[in-house]
């Protein structure tokens, strides 16, 4: 459990007058025990509502300072200092005064401000909905008092059952997954309402989380210029892949894992879940006014695995770019070849590579490969590493065989971080590591450097 220790300090003239403080009004200092105790208790209502936290414009450094400057509606100001150890709130004050309501108000407003996540800056019209209130209630829990002393009050943030639930990260994430996105690196929670506007970048550690193909199209392609291709192409079951012989009498449907479902059933499930027909979207559009052909793989659709339809769509895109003399971009996010299609999926590696050979060698056109996390298997072994320029996202997981497969096959430990983009960049595997927020501008400059220019003068 964590403890938040609060030492309240005053620095306002009015409070100094009312509390009888002898400390200088121009400096910070702890509240000293005074005989004017009733004056604080009787006037306690003026602190029942804290309007805002000062210095909200610098929220990135807000938590690192560990000191909160708080002002209420009557312009009475004071600061709160805390250090996190356990999930128990402890208010440590140096007097007999009844500061409990004041500090409780501060805690309440701070938690609300964290749930809002810069709502006062991003959207002044932001209002709480029922789901937000549920999360706030869950975080705050039932406030109860523990053992009291002359110098310290302990406020427990949750009861026993809530503590057990809070420690269960899986239950917490599942319960509120419609509101939060959990970072895979630091396990911090990102508020989903503003997660897309932050390009799926963790606000706690800066890690680049997975992004859907539709979001990437919106990020890279100029508005109103996207023209999809081959949207009606869907996968069949060419080898009639069925992992198990289903017995409707003996098999409990609840115990049926998604990996054991028939291939067609899994395809239908992912199509309904993602709204996509396959694990890649292909089409044409403009980047800063420059016409491009682009294919974007989607890891949410069967792990971005490359089957016969994925290979065919990418091959047709390359052939179209070859005929139209367009620059080509392929954004890779894949677990490799799709095992449910056997050798047909492996054939796509050679087919795509052959089309790229004609595009790059014979026609002398420009292909940019963008490797996102994860890029593994057959995609890494084929078109993922064939770009004229190869760009990787920060901290992307890029490999041919995964860490678990290598360790089980070779019975040796894979060094931590040896399959990260930064490590591989030092070994010369990529041309550049580009953050997501700079990617569009970098692509525009690369295209212009290689002789591809905007269609209009105001295309930049």
Swiss-Prot record:
Enzyme Commission code: 2.1.3.15
Pathway recorded for this protein: Lipid metabolism; malonyl-CoA biosynthesis; malonyl-CoA from acetyl-CoA: step 1/1
Cross-referenced Gene3D superfamilies: 2-enoyl-CoA Hydratase, Chain A, domain 1
Keyword Manganese found: no
Zinc fingers typed C4-type, residue spans: 183-205
SUPFAM superfamilies, alphabetized: ClpP/crotonase
UniProt enzyme class: transferase
Reaction equations catalysed: N(6)-carboxybiotinyl-L-lysyl-[protein] + acetyl-CoA = N(6)-biotinyl-L-lysyl-[protein] + malonyl-CoA
Keywords carried by this UniProt record: ATP-binding, Chloroplast, Fatty acid biosynthesis, Fatty acid metabolism, Lipid biosynthesis, Lipid metabolism, Metal-binding, Nucleotide-binding, Plastid, Transferase, Zinc, Zinc-finger
Alphabetical GO biological process terms: fatty acid biosynthetic process; malonyl-CoA biosynthetic process
Manner of cofactor binding, per the entry note: Binds 1 zinc ion per subunit.
Location of this chain's protein in the cell: Plastid, Chloroplast stroma
Function per UniProt: Component of the acetyl coenzyme A carboxylase (ACC) complex. Biotin carboxylase (BC) catalyzes the carboxylation of biotin on its carrier protein (BCCP) and then the CO(2) group is transferred by the transcarboxylase to acetyl-CoA to form malonyl-CoA.
Protein name: Acetyl-coenzyme A carboxylase carboxyl transferase subunit beta, chloroplastic
Originating organism: Cicer arietinum (Chickpea)
């Amino acid at each position: 459990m964590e403890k938040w220790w609060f030492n309240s300090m005053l620095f306002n003239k009015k409070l100094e007058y009312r509390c009888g403080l002898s400390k200088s009004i121009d400096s910070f200092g702890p509240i000293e025990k005074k005989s004017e105790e009733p004056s604080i208790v009787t006037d306690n209502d003026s602190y029942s509502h804290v309007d805002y936290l000062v210095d909200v414009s610098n929220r990135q450094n807000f938590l690192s300072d560990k000191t909160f400057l708080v002002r209420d509606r009557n312009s009475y100001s004071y600061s709160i200092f805390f250090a996190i150890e356990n999930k128990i709130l402890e208010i440590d004050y140096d007097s007999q005064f009844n500061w409990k309501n004041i500090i409780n108000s501060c805690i309440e407003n701070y938690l609300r401000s964290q749930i809002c996540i810069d709502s006062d800056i991003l959207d002044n019209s932001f209002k709480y909905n029922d789901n937000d209130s549920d999360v706030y209630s869950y975080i705050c829990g039932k406030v109860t008092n523990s053992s009291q002393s002359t110098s310290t009050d302990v406020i427990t943030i949750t009861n026993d059952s809530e503590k057990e639930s809070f420690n269960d990260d899986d239950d917490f994430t599942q319960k509120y997954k419609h509101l939060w996105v959990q970072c895979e690196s630091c396990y911090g929670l990102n508020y989903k309402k503003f997660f897309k506007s932050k390009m799926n970048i963790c606000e706690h550690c800066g890690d680049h989380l997975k992004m859907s193909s539709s979001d990437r199209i919106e990020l890279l392609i100029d508005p109103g210029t996207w023209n999809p291709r081959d949207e009606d192409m869907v996968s069949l079951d060419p080898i009639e892949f069925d992992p198990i012989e289903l017995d409707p009498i003996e098999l409990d449907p609840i115990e049926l894992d998604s990996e054991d479902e028939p291939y067609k059933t899994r395809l239908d499930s992912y199509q309904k879940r993602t709204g996509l027909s396959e694990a890649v979207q292909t089409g044409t559009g403009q980047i800063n006014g420059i016409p491009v052909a682009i294919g974007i793989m989607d890891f949410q659709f069967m792990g971005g695995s490359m089957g016969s339809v994925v290979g065919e769509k990418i091959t047709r895109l390359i052939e179209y770019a070859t005929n139209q003399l367009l620059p080509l971009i392929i954004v890779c996010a894949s677990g490799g070849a799709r095992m449910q299609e056997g050798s047909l999926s492996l054939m796509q590696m050679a087919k795509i590579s052959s089309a790229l050979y004609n595009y790059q060698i014979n026609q002398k056109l420009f292909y940019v490969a963008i490797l996102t996390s994860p890029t593994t298997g057959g995609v890494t072994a084929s078109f993922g590493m064939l770009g004229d320029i190869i760009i990787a996202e920060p901290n992307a997981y890029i490999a041919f065989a995964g860490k678990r497969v290598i360790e089980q096959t070779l019975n040796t430990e894979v060094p931590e971080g040896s399959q990260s983009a930064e490590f591989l960049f030092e070994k010369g595997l990529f041309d550049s590591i580009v953050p997501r927020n700079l990617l569009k501008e970098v692509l525009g400059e690369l295209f212009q450097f290689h002789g591809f220019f905007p269609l209009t003068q105001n295309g930049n």
